[in-house]
Design a protein with these regions (language model features):
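Basic, Lys/Arg- and aromatic-enriched nucleic-acid-binding interface segment
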Residues: 126, 130, 156-211, 240, ...
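Conserved tyrosine-mediated DNA breakage-rejoining catalytic core shared by Y-recombinases
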Residues: 210-253
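N-terminal helical hairpins
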Residues: 3-82, 93
Length: 355
């Protein structure tokens, strides 16, 4: 018995017919050649079937890269933001521009190396090159799995300098953060609420911009913000789901949001007017305003780096730091249990309160 490894009726029917045809060809081959191959009884039946299957593969059985992209987006793209489809499609376009749209078994290591060299020549940073290779490898591997192909991925294991062009983000000094928070309180509008909210929680911008008002819990013994997945805003990793106690400027911002007269269910309605949270729009607007107050090279994301430094400076244990920031620690033990309670997290956050 062989599993067709798909829930899609169309693909199941196609693969069932294909498997049936391959078996029929195999038995026909045995009937015709058995008398001519004295050592056949000693051969591995598994190897024979595999070899016969590969010999009988036709172009019709193997998808091209465009078809591989389509099935990848159809199944893996469900519930993902538009940026996911856009990034995968962009990478596909790059590969086609360099090597053309071919059947998967026709792509070579040479194609992969030319793709790498083209990305580098284009001026992409090491992290961007890594991201493009991640997408093309995922598209290729998913199609190989779905179509049960015996193919190696020519885009796997290609070397490139991951540090090329990467600018290390500098943390923002604590005194500058305090000045920034005071300016936010002075202006007191929704853009400044978002900056203040991020400043004392270490949240990612997309996490903050996609919040519901109901994610801000102010009536508990310890006020906190709940970071959870929403249809309009995904989370980066499983570790990103967490509760962060609210202190200082972040608590102030949460109170302003809850007490605002806006009837929207979103904490930041202006960035949630479409199907997905417009984190890029928020980034552009907030970084432009912050530029006058922070050192050169610092951005809104620097607040996240700063929170890690602030916690480190008070000798906060690394696993607590990781839980507050939603960082993946890489240690096995952190995947067990429910993590630290709000009282423990709050104790350490209170130590870095700038007020």
């Amino acid at each position: 018995m062989k599993s067709l490894r798909t829930k899609c009726f169309r693909r199941a029917k196609l693969q069932a017919n294909q498997t049936s045809a391959n078996l029929e060809k195999y038995w026909s081959h045995l009937r015709l050649t058995a008398s001519e191959v004295p050592e056949m009884s000693k051969m591995s039946i598994v190897d024979m079937i595999k070899d016969e299957k590969q010999r009988n593969k036709t172009a019709k059985d193997i998808p091209d890269l465009k078809q591989a992209l389509a099935i990848y987006l159809e199944l893996k793209g469900r519930g993902r933001p538009k940026s996911f489809e856009a990034a995968a499609t962009r990478t596909y376009g790059y590969v086609v521009q360099i090597a053309g749209n071919k059947l998967l078994d026709q792509y070579t290591r040479s194609d992969a190396l030319r793709f790498r060299d083209w990305l580098v020549k284009k001026g992409l940073t090491g992290s961007s090159v890594t991201r493009n290779f991640s997408y093309i490898k995922a598209i290729f591997n998913f199609a190989v799995s779905e179509y049960a192909l015996d193919l190696s991925n020519p885009f796997a294991g290609v070397y490139h300098d991951r540090s090329a062009g990467v600018v290390k983000r500098q943390p923002i000094p604590s005194d500058v953060i305090r000045t920034l928070q005071l300016e936010c309180m002075q202006v007191n509008d929704d853009l400044r609420w978002l900056i203040a909210l991020l400043s004392d929680t270490g949240m990612r911008l997309s996490e903050g911009a996609g919040l519901l008002k109901s994610d801000l819990i102010l009536d508990a013994d310890i006020s906190f913000v709940r970071i959870q997945k929403h249809p309009w805003r995904n989370l980066k990793t499983s570790s990103s789901t967490r509760d962060i106690p609210l202190i200082g400027a972040s608590l102030w911002a949460a109170e302003q949001i809850i007490n605002s007269e806006d009837s929207s269910r979103f904490a930041f309605p202006r960035y949630n007017q479409q199907a997905y949270t417009s984190a890029n729009s928020a980034s552009a607007a907030l970084n432009k305003w912050m530029k006058a107050y922070v050192p050169r090279g610092c951005t809104l994301h620097s607040l996240r780096h700063s929170m890690r430094d602030r916690l480190r400076s008070v000798e906060c244990p690394s696993d607590i730091v990781d839980q507050i920031g939603g960082w993946t620690s890489g240690t096995i033990g952190t995947s067990y249990g429910n993590g630290f309670g709000a009282d423990v997290l709050n104790k350490w956050l209170q130590k870095v309160d700038l007020h």
